[in-house]
């Protein structure tokens, strides 16, 4: 619904969830320019001078959209909220993906007036799945142009008259029947977070994450080789509570992340493995080269379909993903110690 045209630019960081990456297809279909702003290994942060260069690409005669996550769902890097004001000054609308940030951090939209802010209630308090929200500034919402209509989004529609009238925003963007059976849970969840306090939640997660990072960094095989390689920040400065890493044997070869997940399941530990729907950060962290990807995607048998297992074979047995462990408001030190005990089983 964003009014992309051939005079528009869609700028996004390499570090973005696929839900944000996918917007590029709408932009390209309308002739807009799409630009990616890289993050730099090993910390997976953006260089400020590169940001300034890319923000200068705003087209004066078109709508420009800059999208980035407040917190990476791959590395847990917390990108500066100050970018919002900098981008506005350079002529950009800003989409701030706060899905990973909002569960454990206070976000003041008066101080940081992003135009569009998607959040996930499931990530904030674990229930219900499939219910989120797009928080949009009124002026930004007026820019959106729905390319179609559906039930629940119009006041009047006619077949013979070939006409429809959209409902006032935000109802014009809420397709179908709202999930009224689960929506009351959102109120309960928000009240619970408020009763605990976001500052307390933030500090608790920071302490647990710091303890986990410290212990993972210290784990070494008997020959001195590190067991764990952490992607992104190795301390708690400007980072969230998810840690992405790979495990290595004493010879320095990566241990397959899928196998680690299977082992974790047997120990009653829930992990996420893969690239976590964030291919840009994953490709840079794992040193997957553009030419390797091009060679893989251009194979005749990969024109229409490519499974994840086929992709893993295609990139010469490089690590195609990582292991992610997430610390949240209900995590405690016993959870951390159980995970660390599990990790120690890989030491040789």
Predicted regions and their residues:
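Pyridoxal 5′-phosphate
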Residues: 1-348
């Amino acid at each position: 619904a964003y009014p992309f045209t051939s005079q528009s630019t869609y700028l996004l960081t390499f570090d973005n969830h696929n839900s944000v990456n996918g917007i590029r297809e709408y932009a390209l279909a309308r002739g807009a320019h799409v630009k990616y702003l890289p993050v730099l290994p090993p910390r997976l942060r953006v260089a400020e001078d590169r940001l300034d260069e890319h923000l200068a690409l705003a087209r004066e005669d078109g709508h420009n959209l800059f999208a980035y996550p407040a917190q990476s769902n791959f590395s847990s890097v917390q990108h500066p909220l100050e970018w919002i004001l900098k981008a506005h000054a350079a002529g950009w609308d800003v989409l701030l993906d706060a899905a990973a940030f909002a569960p454990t951090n206070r976000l003041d939209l008066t101080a940081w007036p992003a135009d569009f802010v998607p959040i996930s209630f499931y990530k904030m308090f674990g229930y219900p799945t499939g219910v989120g929200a797009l928080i949009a500034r009124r002026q930004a919402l007026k820019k959106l142009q729905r390319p179609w209509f559906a039930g629940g989004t119009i006041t009047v529609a006619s077949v013979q008259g070939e006409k429809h009238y959209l409902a006032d925003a935000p109802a014009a963007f809420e397709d179908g029947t709202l999930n009224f059976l689960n929506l009351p849970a959102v109120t309960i969840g928000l009240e619970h977070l408020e009763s605990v306090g976001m500052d307390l939640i933030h500090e608790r997660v920071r302490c647990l994450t710091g303890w986990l990072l410290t212990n993972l960094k210290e784990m070494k095989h008997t020959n001195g080789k590190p067991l764990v390689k952490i992607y992104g920040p190795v301390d708690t400065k400007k980072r969230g509570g998810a840690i992405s890493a790979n495990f290595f044997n004493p010879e320095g070869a990566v241990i397959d992340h899928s196998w680690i997940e299977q082992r974790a399941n047997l120990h009653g530990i829930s992990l996420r493995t893969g690239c976590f729907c964030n291919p840009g950060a994953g490709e840079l962290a794992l040193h997957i080269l553009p030419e390797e990807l091009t060679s893989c995607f251009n194979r005749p048998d990969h024109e229409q379909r490519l499974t994840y297992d086929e992709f893993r074979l295609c990139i010469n047995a490089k690590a195609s993903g990582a292991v992610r462990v997430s610390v949240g408001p209900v995590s405690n030190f016993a959870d951390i110690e159980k995970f660390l005990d599990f990790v120690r089983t890989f030491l040789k």
